Amino acid sequence: MLSIRLSRPTDLEPFCAFLRSVHVHAEALEDGSVRASVPGAPTPLHERRELSGYVTTWNALNPGRSAEVV
């Protein structure tokens, strides 16, 4: 399970919906971050790489907004 920080609190729900659309478990936290996990990821490294790819895609599709795996 990894944490992802967003630049805008208003992006919390749209970002979680984006992750869920690619079958990632995503939970919005009160501090404005997202806790995410990839079901069936064989290793933590695989999970990090896959989530990093989704974060990169989100950032490319949403100019001026950013998400970052922390």
Regions found by a protein language model. Name each.
Residues 8-12, 48-51:
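Generic alpha-helical secondary structure
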Residues 37-70:
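C-terminal basic regulatory modules in eukaryotic proteins
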Residues 11, 33, 41-43:
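Generic "edge-of-domain/loop-turn" microfeature
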Residues 13-33:
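A short, structured beta-strand/loop element
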Residues 1-6:
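Short glycine-/aliphatic-rich beta-strand segments at the starts of folded cytosolic domains
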